[in-house]
Design a protein with these regions (language model features):
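Membrane-proximal periplasmic segments of bacterial cell-envelope enzymes
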Residues: 1-331, 335, 340-390, 396, ...
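Conserved helix-loop functional segments at active or binding sites
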Residues: 352-359, 674, 708, 756, ...
Length: 867
């Protein structure tokens, strides 16, 4: 019993000692050391850093890299949100001035995004970087609010107006006022010149515009040298807010080659892209070309691609340890359909061709200057010569683009570093660039009259619709005069503006006698296709142009494509087209003629009102002009009563007055007559003139359909998309836009006619142009390897003995029996269609040469196997 009590006492004492020790330790941890832990916790923090994936590459069809991102270093500026005193602001400005000098001494340059610019007159002005007034006002507002300028009273009034273009910004700070305020706000030294001060303003402006993401640094210089990186790090103590970071820089290793296809990048992220997709305002994103259209695949900067690094930092902001790391996902690679070697050949061929034509035209102008002066009494400099052009090579069996050239070109690498004033001048503001628009892809965005290359479409349509047999023989009569029977059974003719055949003389019409469809294509006889178009009618001609894909976008994965037009009342002028305000839409008509007529009508109506000494009401004049134009529906009936009624209702001129002033009604009727489709316009459309306009890329798929006998493909320049491991993310398979089902006899006639165009034996219109290429002629023409068609669409004045302002077209497909490719060459102001023959020779020589080298008998045997 005693032993049990003793054991109990001993155990109790031990437990009490242990409990005491535990209580003491708990006291020490919570009370004594707690303050230390609390202090340590207060001196540490966590921060997360977004990690962006590398932008994907752009490759040609064989895997050759056309665009990639290389590792580089940037200089960044991060303003501590807690440091907002005047002293802090002055310190940041001093640091930026020093950093800018370091960067520039190291061969780099800082961002130049300030909205404040120095005009040619020496006065400060705003440049908002957007064209529309509404967009300018939106940026102006954001700028003022971000910079802390008080415009609240003005906004109260303006925000009641939905249309920002109508906002009154007259009380907002001028560029001069803003510049003065910002220099003072940021303590920019008074002796610092404008050019250097504005560099500081650019950086500080970006910080405030990015204020709601103030934790993100602003990149102030891209792709700087290692010397700059070392200097920034060495002087870190005096460069408050400055740091360097590893990044990537986009590189286009082939410079100007394929520039219009690849496009370029810019720091153009919108607020929506930043908030919804996770982009930073510093991110470079696609602005044009493949870089733009395939942005969602190429980018590594969106939320779904970005990774994250979570760091623990001490009170000085230095990282203590990494708490977590989520790797970023790189952007996908985009493989194109183009062959970069063929692309290079095509671009060189086009550039050489334009230079050759331009030289020939300049020589012709000098030789015939006297005749020009007599004919026009004008300055010879008014005539334009070849300066631009486009070329497309397409796989006729898939619709894939193998090469696409636009001249002149540009270097997309320039946009990465930011355009220098000299580069900006060269691309956008020089006399040459204004005339030639180097950054515009003319293969998809330029619409031009096709001229004679459209004749195959007219011929196929007429034969397929049964209004003309392919073997029917039609003889040229030089001038095509429309003959018809009126409602009273009387024979009538329309001789005004009668189109002529290209023979240029009635004495030569025997050369175009008894022509079949194939003959007419070979001879390029305007008369024949006027007859075909007249029988067919404009509606059917429009329909068939649509079937060939000439009046719609092709679907190519590039920005800026426009669609072609042929003709008809709705094309010339559509009186049913209305705008957002419910009235007739003039601006979005398919041709420019309605705009001209609208202005003329308003001028005429103003004269009517002023002749009566009445006050001119501009809104009433506008309404009246539009209502008058709505009368033009293509019907030829007399519209006099309706004209008088509308004038009376809108501008208060009684019908009794206009009844007496028949000259007034006649002048209105004459203007309305300008926007009425006429039979003479139908026949001109038949040989690719008049209102007919097409793009080179649409012509390429049209010629492809002629070659493959009826399959009109959607056009593609993207082959597939692959992730960073090489797995296919998206495959772009050939797709059919339309299938034309007609008899083989019609296709045979077209093929035969196009063969004849280049054949010396057949005396085709382009045959003589190949005389300077005897080897090519012997190897490829004499063996009937390809067929072609020239086009010389008139686009300018035509003085005596001077006829150079024509668009030069040459289209071809090859080989003729089993076609593989279609080629389109287009040179505005290019003299004549046959002028483009040198480029065709260069491209086909390369293409046929590559095919011959790839023939089985020419392949090299390795270890007994043929590769």
């Amino acid at each position: 019993m005693k032993n049990s009590i003793s054991r109990f006492i001993i155990i109790s004492l031990v437990l009490m000692c242990l409990m005491g020790a535990l209580i003491y330790k708990l006291h020490e941890v919570t009370i004594v050391e707690g303050a230390q832990y609390a202090e340590a916790a207060a001196n540490t923090s966590t921060s997360s850093i977004d990690i962006k994936g590398t932008r994907g590459r752009i490759l040609d069809r064989n895997g050759v890299v056309l665009a990639y991102s290389k590792n580089s270093y940037n200089v960044e500026f991060l303003r501590d949100a807690d440091n907002r005193t005047d002293y802090d602001s002055a310190t940041y400005t001093d640091s930026l001035i020093k950093a800018i000098k370091i960067i520039e001494d190291g061969g780099g340059k800082t961002i130049d995004t300030s909205y404040i610019r120095l005009g040619e007159d020496g006065k400060l002005k705003y440049e908002w970087g957007v064209k529309s007034r509404a967009a300018q006002v939106a940026r102006y507002k954001n700028f003022c609010q971000s910079m802390g300028f008080n415009i609240s009273e003005s906004l109260k009034k303006n925000e009641k107006i939905e249309d920002k273009s109508k906002w009154d910004t007259s009380t907002w700070p001028t560029a001069e006022e803003a510049y003065t305020k910002l220099r003072a706000l940021w303590f920019i030294p008074e002796d610092l010149p404008f050019e250097d001060a504005n560099k500081v303003i650019s950086i500080r402006q970006e910080v405030l515009l990015n204020n709601y993401r103030a934790y993100e640094p602003i990149t102030i210089a891209y792709d700087v040298s290692m010397e700059v990186v070392a200097e920034i790090k060495l002087r870190a103590d005096e460069l408050t807010g400055l740091q360097t970071s590893q990044s990537t820089t986009r590189v286009y290793p082939r410079g100007t080659t394929a520039a219009h296809i690849l496009g370029y990048l810019g720091r153009t992220a919108t607020e929506e892209m930043v908030k919804e997709k996770g982009y930073s305002y510093d991110d470079y994103i696609g602005v044009s070309g493949i870089e733009y259209t395939m942005e969602e695949y190429l980018t590594g900067s969106t939320n779904e691609r970005k990774g994250e690094r979570v760091l623990e930092k001490n009170k000085n902001g230095s990282a203590i340890r990494e708490l977590s790391y989520t790797p970023a996902k790189d952007g996908d690679d985009v493989m194109l359909t183009i062959d970069i070697n063929l692309q290079t050949v095509v671009e060189k061929a086009l550039e050489d061709l334009i230079a050759k034509i331009d030289e020939k035209e300049e020589k012709q102008l000098l030789e015939r200057y006297a005749d020009y002066e007599k004919a026009t009494n004008d300055d010879v400099e008014g005539i334009k010569t070849a300066k631009t052009g486009a070329a497309v090579v397409m796989n006729v069996n898939t619709g894939q683009v193998l090469a696409m050239a636009s001249y002149p070109s540009f270097n997309p690498n320039w946009f990465i570093a930011g355009l220098s004033p000299e580069q900006n001048q060269e691309l956008f503001n020089s006399e040459f660039s204004v005339e030639t628009t180097p950054t515009r892809n003319k293969a998809i965005s330029t619409k031009l009259a096709p001229g004679s290359i459209f004749k195959m479409a007219t011929g196929v349509a007429a034969a397929a619709e049964g209004v003309l047999d392919i073997n029917e023989r039609i003889s040229c009569d030089y001038e095509y005069i429309i003959k018809y029977t009126d409602e009273n059974g009387n024979e009538k003719t329309i001789e005004q503006n009668a189109p002529k055949c290209h023979l240029n003389s009635r004495s030569k019409i025997g050369q175009h006698a008894n022509q079949t469809l194939a003959d007419a294509i070979k001879n390029s006889c305007n008369y024949y296709f006027c007859e075909a178009a007249y029988r067919l009618g404009i509606d059917k001609l429009n329909e068939w142009a649509g079937k060939f894909g000439l009046t719609s976008r092709t679907g190519i994965e590039l920005t800026g494509e426009t669609e072609g037009i042929v003709g008809g009342q709705k094309v010339l002028f559509d009186n049913t087209l209305t705008g957002e305000d419910g009235t007739l839409d003039i601006a979005n008509q398919k041709t420019s003629l309605p705009g001209l007529v609208y202005r003329k009508l308003k001028e005429t109506l103003v004269k009517f009102v002023e002749s009566r000494n009445a006050e001119v009401d501009e809104e009433a004049i506008n309404r009246c002009a539009k209502r008058l134009m709505e009368l033009q529906d293509g019907d030829i009936t007399n519209k006099g009563p309706e004209i008088r009624r509308i004038i009376s209702e809108e501008i208060d001129i009684p019908e009794g007055i206009t009844q007496m002033r028949k000259d007034w009604i006649n002048s209105i009727s004459s203007l309305l007559n300008e926007i009425q489709w006429k039979p003479t316009q139908t026949i001109r459309a038949g040989f690719g003139q008049g209102t007919t306009l097409v793009t080179p890329v649409a012509v390429a798929r049209y010629v492809s359909a002629l070659a493959n006998r009826g399959t009109v493909y959607d056009v593609h320049i993207v082959d597939k998309v692959m992730d960073s491991s090489g797995s296919t993310v998206k495959n772009v398979a050939p797709s059919v836009y339309n299938q034309i089902e007609i008899s083989d006899d019609i296709w045979d006639a077209v093929s035969s006619g196009m063969k004849g165009v280049v054949s010396p034996e057949d005396g085709g219109t382009a045959s003589s142009a190949f005389k300077d290429y005897p080897e090519f002629r012997k190897k490829y023409i004499d063996t009937e390897m390809f067929g072609g068609k020239t086009g010389s669409a008139q686009i300018g004045r035509r003085a005596k003995n001077i006829d150079i302002e024509n668009t030069s077209w040459f289209v071809t497909f090859a080989p003729r029996e089993q076609p593989e490719i279609a080629i389109v060459i287009c040179v505005p102001y290019g003299l004549s269609g046959s002028s483009s023959v040198p480029a065709i020779v260069d491209i086909l020589t390369y293409y046929f040469g590559q095919s011959e080298n790839a023939a089985p008998e020419n392949l090299v045997a390795i270890n007994g196997l043929t590769e």
